[in-house]
């Protein structure tokens, strides 16, 4: 069953943020569901919300530096437990095997990194 989450949304480029909700998928075996307590809005979010970089996906929930508490973990998750306090940066996954990842530069993953915002 999808999870309804309150959010500040931008529906089109340049629109003001408005309160709403988004539907999230069920927690999968490798997922961690977090009750978000804080999310930062930085200038890259504003660029995205204004469609200044040409890659925006709408509707958009700006804010990609996140802090909260783990509500649920998938069956295969071993590093987090319900109740853990967590912080999430801009990138949440990469191949962890290519030259860039091994050098600690996951944002330049040669196989593609997973960002926390804008579906990219």
What are the residue ranges of the model-derived segments?
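Short structural boundary motif marking the start of a folded domain
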Residues: 2-8
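Residue-level signal for short segments within beta-strands and strand-turn junctions
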Residues: 9-12, 50, 70, 102
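Short N-terminal binding/cap micro-motifs at the start of the first secondary-structure element
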Residues: 14-19, 43-44
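NAD(P)H dinucleotide-binding glycine-rich loop of Rossmann-like/cofactor-binding domains
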Residues: 16, 94-120
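Generic structural detector for well-ordered beta-strands
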Residues: 21-23
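Glycine-rich beta-strand-centered segment in the early N-terminal region that forms part
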Residues: 25-39, 52-99, 107
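Cytochrome P450 core scaffold surrounding the K-helix E-X-X-R motif
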Residues: 44-50
């Amino acid at each position: 069953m999808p999870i309804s989450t309150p959010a500040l949304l931008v529906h089109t480029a340049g629109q003001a943020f408005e309160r709403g909700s988004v539907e999230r998928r069920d927690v999968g075996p490798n997922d961690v569901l977090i009750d978000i307590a804080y999310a930062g809005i930085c200038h890259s979010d504003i660029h995205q919300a204004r469609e200044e970089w040409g890659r925006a996906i709408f509707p958009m929930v700006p804010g990609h530096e996140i802090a909260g508490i783990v509500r649920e973990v998938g069956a295969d998750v071993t590093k987090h437990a319900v109740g853990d306090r967590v912080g999430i940066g801009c990138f949440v996954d990469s191949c962890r095997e290519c030259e860039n990842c091994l050098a600690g530069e996951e944002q330049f993953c040669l196989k593609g990194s997973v960002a926390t915002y804008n579906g990219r």
